[in-house]
């Protein structure tokens, strides 16, 4: 009888523990209803056809606007992040408060400031791989999560992206990090952290990307 009772306690604890850590025994992290709405919103921005590298763009719409421009044409990762956040009524450093040039580096610094805290941004805490699990879980719950790194050379762009709500296993997160949607040299509606930040990472697991979550759910 005692052995049966211990077995029953273990069986009852399994779903509780998997719920606490956000992972089902088989299914991994799942996208919740608010996360599905956020994912649909991100996809509606059509990042694969707007905010295209090599063209000067209207930062809010991503449409090319100055064909004769010779500056501000490189990539538009931080402008895409800023535009998405603005449409969700969430403030992150953006024009006209800072120009598009080197905006990701400036956003990286700003997100660690009291102004960012007042705007609802908080750092996602943790170490590899728990940090990736937490960032993906928050996005899956419908929170806006930014992945960002600053270039050691402040005259060279950093990189910024949004964590995309997506079902994920612990193994997948350990191997490649959270799912992202991003503009860059090539724009992607879905790409892993390892692939999307590849040119900025000295190795894997990496320790240069920071994650910030806004405390207001858009949906």
Predicted regions and their residues:
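Positively charged n-region of N-terminal signal peptides that target proteins for export
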Residues: 1-10
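Aromatic (phenylalanine/tyrosine) cluster motif
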Residues: 4, 21-23
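Bacterial N-terminal signal peptides
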Residues: 14-19
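N-terminal capping segments
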Residues: 24-104
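...with weaker cross-activation on analogous glycine-rich loops/strands in unrelated enzymes
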Residues: 99-185
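Low-complexity, Gly/Ser/Thr/Pro-rich intrinsically disordered linker/tail segments
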Residues: 176-219
């Amino acid at each position: 009888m005692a052995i049966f009772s211990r077995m029953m306690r273990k069986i009852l604890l399994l779903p509780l523990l998997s719920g606490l850590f956000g992972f089902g025994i088989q299914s991994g992290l799942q996208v919740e209803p608010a996360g599905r709405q956020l994912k649909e919103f991100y996809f509606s921005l059509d990042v694969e056809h707007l905010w295209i590298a090599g063209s000067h763009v209207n930062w809010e719409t991503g449409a090319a606007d100055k064909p004769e421009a010779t500056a501000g044409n490189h990539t538009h990762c931080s402008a895409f992040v800023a535009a998405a956040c603005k449409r969700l009524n969430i403030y992150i450093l953006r024009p006209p408060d800072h120009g598009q040039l080197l905006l990701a580096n400036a956003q990286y610094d700003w997100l660690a400031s009291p102004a960012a805290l007042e705007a609802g941004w908080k750092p996602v805490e943790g170490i590899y791989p728990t940090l990736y699990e937490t960032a993906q879980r928050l996005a899956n719950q419908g929170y806006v999560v930014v992945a960002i790194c600053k270039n050691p050379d402040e005259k060279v762009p950093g990189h910024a992206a949004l964590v995309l709500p997506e079902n994920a296993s612990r193994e997948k997160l350990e191997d490649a990090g959270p799912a992202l949607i991003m503009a860059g040299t090539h724009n992607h509606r879905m790409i892993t952290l390892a692939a999307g930040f590849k040119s900025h990472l000295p190795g894997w697991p990496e320790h240069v990307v920071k994650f910030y979550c806004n405390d207001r759910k858009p949906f």
